[in-house]
C-alpha cells in the first residue's frame, strides 16, 4: 500500500515539476510487525520496494540494534535514517554503521513535557514563584530563539 502512495506522490510531483524529497518510513521494529528473527529481512525488502516506488530515503522507527543497523544500511539502495532510541549509540558511531540521518523523534518534546509537568506540580503544591525563575531563559533569549 505504501508503495502505491509513494509512486503516486512521485508521479504527481514530477508532473508538476516539483523536486520532492520522499522519506519512506517503516514501523517493522517500532511495532514488531514481524517476529524478531525476520525484521532485518523484512526491513530490507520494504526498502527495496520503496526505492523502486520512488523514495529517496528510508526511516526505520525503533531500530536500535547495531548489527541490524549495519546490515540494513549495507543492503539498501538509499540512505538509512533512524530516530533517537534507548540503547542507540551516539551519532558518530551510527555514521560508521551507515546511518545518514539521526532524528530526535519525539524525545525532545517528551523530555520537555516531563519537566513542564514536574514544574507545574511543584508550583501548584507550593505556590512558590521562585520556581519560575530557576533554570529558565530570559525573555530576550526566548525572543532570539524565535527570530529567524
Language-model regions: role of each:
Residues 1-104, 110-118:
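Alpha/beta enzyme core
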Residues 11-12, 107-148:
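Extended, intrinsically disordered, low-complexity segments
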Amino acid at each position: 500500500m505504501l508503495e502505491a502512495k509513494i509512486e503516486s506522490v512521485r508521479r504527481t510531483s514530477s508532473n508538476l515539476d516539483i523536486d520532492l524529497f520522499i522519506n519512506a518510513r517503516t514501523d517493522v521494529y517500532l511495532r514488531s510487525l514481524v517476529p524478531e528473527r525476520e525484521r532485518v529481512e523484512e526491513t530490507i525488502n520494504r526498502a527495496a520496494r520503496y526505492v523502486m516506488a520512488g523514495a529517496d530515503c528510508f526511516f526505520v522507527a525503533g531500530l536500535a540494534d547495531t548489527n541490524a543497523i549495519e546490515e540494513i544500511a549495507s543492503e539498501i539502495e538509499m540512505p538509512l535514517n533512524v530516530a533517537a532510541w534507548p540503547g542507540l549509540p551516539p551519532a558518530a558511531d551510527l555514521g560508521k554503521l551507515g546511518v545518514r540521518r539521526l532524528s530526535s523523534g519525539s524525545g525532545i518534546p517528551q523530555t520537555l513535557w516531563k519537566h513542564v509537568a514536574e514544574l507545574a506540580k511543584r508550583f501548584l503544591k507550593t505556590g512558590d514563584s521562585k520556581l519560575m525563575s530557576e533554570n529558565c531563559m530570559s525573555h530576550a533569549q526566548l525572543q532570539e530563539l524565535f527570530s529567524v
